[in-house]
Amino acid sequence: CSTCLDKP
């Protein structure tokens, strides 16, 4: 993820 608090 780019705008999330995730890795992808």
From Swiss-Prot:
Record has Secreted as a keyword: yes
GO molecular function: toxin activity
Domain of life: Eukaryota
Keywords, sorted A to Z: Secreted, Toxin
Tissue distribution: Expressed by the venom gland.
Record localization: Secreted
GO terms for cellular component: extracellular region
Disulfide partners: none
Keyword Phosphoprotein among UniProt keywords: no
Protein name, as recorded: Toxin To31
Biological classification of the source: Eukaryota, Metazoa, Ecdysozoa, Arthropoda, Chelicerata
